[in-house]
Structure formats: C-alpha cells, structure tokens
Swiss-Prot record:
Residues 307-375 are annotated as: Disordered. It is found in: Cytoplasm. Residues 323-332 have a biased composition (Gly residues). This is Eukaryotic translation initiation factor 3 subunit F. One of its GO terms (cellular component) is eukaryotic 43S preinitiation complex. Residues 30-166 form the MPN domain. Its main location: cytoplasm. It holds the Pfam family MitMem_reg. Residues 336-345, 358-375 have a biased composition (Basic and acidic residues). GO terms for molecular function: metallopeptidase activity; translation initiation factor activity; translation initiation factor binding.
C-alpha cells in the first residue's frame, strides 16, 4: 500500500550534472515486491545483538523514462557502525552485485536499505556511495528504503531519494538531503494466498496451518468478501448519518469499484456461478479418477513384472523337458513309420521274414532220421 503521509515530492536532477549530460528525473513511484521485504526482515532477525541496524543492496528494474523503480530482490552487506565512523565491506558488495547481475541480467542496482527509520550522517555517506558513478546508480538516483523492525511495533517502511547539499565538493561528499517518495507494496493473488496461509499459523500453538481445498478456499474468500461489504455498508451509513467524517478519496474509490460491477441480472450471475461450480467439480472428479487409474496401472504393472519373473523359470524348464520328450517321440514315430512302410511294400508279410539258419547238429539229426525211415 502507498504511504499515507503527505510530503512534497521534487522531481529534479540529483548530483552534479556534467557538461553534455541530460538531467536525470527522480522516480515518481517505488514498487516493492513482498519477497524483498521478507529478505530484509530475515536479515534483521539474524543480526548480532549489539547491532542497531543492518544494511544491504536493493536490486530491481527501472522503467525506460526512470519514473518508476521496482524493487525485486536484496542481499545483505556487512558493515560496522560506531558513534564516530562507519565501515562498509565494499569489496563484498561489488562481488555479490556481480554474481546477482550475472544470475539475473534483467535486474539492476537501484539502491540500498537499512533496518532503522533514523537518518544520520552515516546514511548520507552510504547514500553517496550507492548513487556515485562507476559502481553506483549514476545517472539515476539511488533509492534508500528504511524498514523499522522494533519489537512490539508495526513494521514501518519509507522510501527516499537524495539531493546533494554543501558549499564545497568535500562537504557534498558526506552530506545529502533525503527526499521522501511515494511507494507501494505490490503483490499478486498467489502471493496473497500464500501469505494468508502462513498467517493462519500465527495463533496456533504448533505454528502449523492446514492447506485448504479449492472449495474451502472459495468459501473463505466469499466470506471475506461478504465481511468487507458489510464493513463498507456500515461506513457509508455512518457517513450518511453524519456519525463519521466523509472522505472524498474513499468515496471516489468506492464509486470506481461499483462501476466495475457487471450490468447483469442477479439470476444470471447465480446461474453462471452454479455452472462454474459444476465445471470445477467435474474437473476435480476427472483429475481424481485419472490419478487413481494411474496408480492402479502402476501397481498392476509392478505385480505383473514380479509374477512374470517367477513363472518364467518354470515355463523354461517345462519347455526343455518337452523338447527332450518331443525328440524321443519323433524317433519312435519315425521307426514306426519305417516298419509300416516295409509292410506296405510286401504283399505277404510272412514272405518277408528272414530264413532261419540250421546248425550242424540239426542237419545230422535230420539225416539219421531220414535213414531210419527208409529202413
């Protein structure tokens, strides 16, 4: 959200302008991404107990005309600060900046941050370092973002640019006039939903939050919208009854919001909404069905592979035994076919029998028997 405090915003060249150099216009708006703020808060929580504040570098994008700066990411820079002097690890800052710009070529150096709302002489020194030529943001002004992180108080954020002050160049090097500029924290619906889910665990003892389903999230969103409508209605009624002061800006905002409402009948809106709910339910049912089918298919494939490996060995053994038995069967069958072929070639099977060879004793006995018969 934008800063509510009123201030005078000056758009003017910052720093000494060289001959032939066009004047640089200060940014009219600073956009802060939520992840950049989270990084700053995390750095503040990890600081040493004796450190009052920590500083770091701001990275982001800048519009072509330089009127808008978007802060997307940050990284911490070590520094030592006392009542008399301040020391910043400039070499570390340069190396980390080179690494970040190599990983994200679209981002550029836009400024620096500090976790304290106080502006002092050391702030001017650091500001001049970040806005200088060479490794600084020159010819664009450097944005200084302050984030107060005092315990027990709300987080307060401010954005500044600087203008050089001082009669001489030596005095201008350690002096600067900080000029506040408007800013806004811009986030999308996904980031808002994630932040609400994280914030739901704030009051829980276990610091855990359950993730809502689509239907539950839709129900909560509708309840929030109804609550906001009731709150706005009560405010409008109190203004009409002169119980609360009127706000022209708020009235204009409400008027613009009402102008965005579609000019349709409530019955048509209800019908379209019910159709949308039916579509969401159908898509959810189909997604669950496909997920279940895929899981079942994977389990069946796994079971088939497991059972196939066990039965494969048994089938191979049976196959080998069958092959051996088959060979014997083919041999016997072949011999049977040969015998049947010989029988077919002989019209009288008994003629094909081989002659029996008689021994010497048998022939002698036959001869004696023949002599006796003759007698």
């Amino acid at each position: 959200m934008a800063e509510a405090d009123s201030f005078l915003h000056l758009a003017r060249p910052l720093g000494p302008v060289a001959v032939g150099t066009a004047p640089t216009t200060a940014p009219l708006n600073v956009v802060i991404q939520p992840q950049a703020l989270f990084s700053i808060l995390d750095h503040s929580l990890r600081r040493n107990a004796d450190q009052e504040r920590v500083i770091g570098t701001l990275l982001g994008t800048r519009s072509e005309d330089g009127t808008e700066v978007e802060i997307r990411s940050t990284f911490a820079v070590g520094h030592t600060e006392t009542t008399d002097q301040v020391e910043v690890d400039m070499e570390y800052q340069k190396q980390m900046l080179a690494l970040h710009l190599k990983a994200n070529p679209k981002e550029v150096l836009v400024g620096w941050y500090a976790t304290s709302s106080e502006l002092n002489t050391f702030s001017a020194l650091i500001q001049n370092f970040y806005s200088g030529q060479g490794d600084g943001t020159w010819p664009h002004p450097a944005v200084h973002l302050t984030v107060s992180t005092e315990a027990g108080k709300d987080i307060e954020t401010r954005a500044y640019i600087s203008a050089p002050v001082g009669v001489t160049a030596e005095r201008a090097a350690d002096s600067a006039a900080f000029i506040p500029v408007p800013y806004e924290i811009r986030y999308g619906e996904a980031e808002k939903s994630g932040l609400e889910a994280i914030g739901a665990a704030r009051d829980a003892e276990e610091r855990r939050a359950n993730i809502f389903t689509d239907i539950e999230a839709l129900e909560r969103a509708i309840e929030d919208v109804l609550g906001m409508i009731d709150r706005v209605s009560r405010y409008v009624e109190s203004v009409i009854d002169e119980e609360a002061p009127a706000s022209t800006a708020l009235g204009q905002y409400l008027l613009n919001t009402l102008a965005l409402a579609p000019k349709v009948e409530p019955a048509d809106i209800e019908r379209d909404f019910n159709n949308h709910i039916q579509d969401v339910l159908v898509v959810s049912y189909l997604a669950n069905t496909i997920r279940t089918q895929m899981e079942l298919s994977n389990r069946l494939a796994t079971a088939q592979l497991t059972l196939g490996g066990e039965s494969g060995s048994g089938e191979s053994g049976d196959k080998r035994g069958g092959q051996r038995g088959g060979k014997g069967g083919r041999g016997g069958q072949q011999r049977t076919q040969e015998r049947s072929g010989e029988e077919a070639r002989a019209p009288y099977p008994f003629l094909c029998q081989p002659r029996r060879t008689r021994s010497y004793e048998e022939r002698t006995n036959e001869a004696q028997n023949g002599k006796e018969e003759k007698k």
